[in-house]
Amino acid sequence: MDNPSPYLQLRIPKPDKQALSFCDASVHGLTEWVAGLPKANLGETARLLYQCLVELNQLETPASNRMKLMELLRPEVLFVCKHLEKHFLNQSVVLDERPRKVANLCQALQNHLAIGYKLIVTQEASQFRKEQPQPLAIALQRSLHSMFGPLVRACQLYCPVPDGLWLEMHLVYRTAVAFNLQHIAVTDPLSHYDAPHSVENAYLAAMLLGCARTNQMRQNAIANLAEAIEGWAPLVHLQTADSPASLFWIAIRQDAPPRLKSLFKDSEKQYLLGINPTPLLDAIEEYLQADASKRAFARLPVTERLTPEQIQHLGAAWGDTAERTFRRIPAQGTMTICLGMSAVHYFLAGEKDFGDVLKAPDEPRNANFASKKKGAPDIWANSFDAQPVARWEPGEPMEEIKYSSPETLIADNNLDKYPVYELLIVNHSPSGYCLSWPREVPSQLQAGELLGIQDTAKQGWSVAVARWIRQVRGGGTQMGIELIAPSAQPCGLQLVRKAGESSQYLRALLLPEIEAISRPPGLITPRMPFQE
């Protein structure tokens, strides 16, 4: 970090306008404009905020005034982005045109928000005074926080991080270090935590997210992590790369996230910063080992929505330095898959419905609509439309009704209910495959989803799980799957309660023992009601 002026490398426009077109460039003028935003129409509000930020970033104004204006706009931008998320999250991994435009709008809003704060960074840094460090420290922290939003959104959409985002974050942090401001406490009213914040903690939150293997997490889990990680950053230390406790390295002059230090080539081992997550890993271990009743008192700040399974994944991502067990081998060909427990159960059972597997099919019952008393008058006989219609003349066309047999209807319904997909094989290893979706991705697909896979139509179905999902620039959507078992026995499982009624039979899979890897027999069940 020998460059004394990293802030000069930030990507920002050169302001050249003297006034704003929509309001006076003052706190009073912008406050009135914000009060008039059509909050009930989020789309229009987002459009107006976008135009406002673009103009404001082209405005020539002192840093102190720009900071006041940005602080007025920041909560409005975060509010709009938060409420627009429902239009593109928890949908298909590959978004349709309209959701994609909404997601791009949110990214653009927070990108321009970050540009506004980076303009303040360059203004304050060029006239910095040690006796007044707060303005620059706040601008640095706000810049990182504004860039954190697009990073989280890219993770949730399993798409590449915007070009230059990592490098801009590194430059902002290097600016803080150059002025010795990385540990200065600043307040942030929009944070999830009341504790004082710092530039280093904001930077560490982004770096931790970058090496959390979010492509193996579901969208809601990533949102929960983004909310909690801000409070975890103080448990992580930035240090020199040559320290033995540095599990991850950051190439601070490259547009890249942190990586395990074992993944760096010799030619890349310069201008590095180390991450020591050991205190955080210890806190995670303590939390997971504590009784559920005592976890609220653990030193790990955790939101209620972050589950122990998700925390366990994070502990492995930040602490597991084991190399890949098997090498990936490029491959060609196709593979057939089905998604979800219901579909996997159906195909493993030889395309039988769950009721047939239980050997308890529903028995047909005949409805009897006869009157209780023979000879009793029909109460509907005097209805205005109860008389027979005799207006049809011979030779008039008649509508033909085509009936389908029940077997045909059931087969057609099952094809719609349990679709199969043919995917391209990118590479494989003994433990799994990398597959590519050539067409639309079903909305059901998420990391952790149970899969059935079939190499050829003559072979049986194997059981697998989707470990990660990513969107490749120009290459569509790819998915990494891990093989769980070469086969499984479909069955029904019932939760028997000592008091009260037992549960209904639910789908489950019996996994065979695999002696070659010393794995005992297993059982896959739905999460509810079969909890540990």
Whereabouts are the PLM-identified features?
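A short macromolecule-binding patch
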Residues: 490-495
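Intrinsically disordered, low-complexity regions
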Residues: 5-9, 17-19, 27, 31, ...
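Short strand-loop-strand
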Residues: 313, 320-460, 468-483, 487-488, ...
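Extended, domain-scale alpha-helical bundle/helix-rich regions
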Residues: 179-371, 376
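Long, leucine/valine-rich, helix-dominated scaffolding and oligomerization segments
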Residues: 2-207
